[in-house]
Design a protein with these regions (language model features):
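Short internal beta-strands
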Residues: 27, 38-44, 71-77
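A glycine-rich helix N-cap at a beta->alpha junction
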Residues: 55-84
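C-terminal structural segments of small proteins and small subunits
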Residues: 86-97
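Short, glycine-/small-residue-enriched flexible loop/hinge segments at domain edges that mediate gating
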Residues: 33-51
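Extreme N-terminal starter segment of soluble prokaryotic enzymes
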Residues: 2-8
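Short, glycine-rich nucleotide/cofactor-binding loops
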Residues: 8-21, 46-52
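Short, glycine/charged-enriched secondary-structure capping and boundary segments
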Residues: 23-24, 55-58, 87-89
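Histidine-anchored nucleotide/phosphate-binding helix
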Residues: 20-33
Length: 97
């Protein structure tokens, strides 16, 4: 894989406006329009709590996964918020980073 074809986004916020009006919109358009071949989102900090507790955000996550975007989450963050099993059950790779 050419590193110039891969986008990594570190998602740290629990602000829903940022998720829907920037992150999700950009990654889905990037994938659909071929701006990047490989898109990876890393959930870090408070973002894991938001994803675990908000069904609207979970629906958006599933759409991203179905479009071929990879999503990973920091295992330590998930454990700190007590959401590791929820995040894993969404199909997100949870690992130490």
């Amino acid at each position: 894989m050419n590193e110039n074809d891969k986008l990594n986004i570190l998602w740290t916020t629990d602000n829903k406006d940022t998720i829907f009006n920037m992150l999700s919109m950009y990654v889905i358009n990037s994938k659909n329009r071929g701006w990047w071949k490989h898109i990876n989102i890393i959930l870090w900090g408070a973002s894991v709590k938001l994803v675990a507790n908000d069904t609207q955000v979970q629906t958006e996550i599933l759409e991203m996964l179905q479009s071929g975007i990879t999503i990973e989450a920091c295992q330590d963050c998930c454990e700190n918020f007590g959401v590791a099993s929820i995040i894993t059950n969404l199909g997100i790779t949870v690992r130490y980073m």
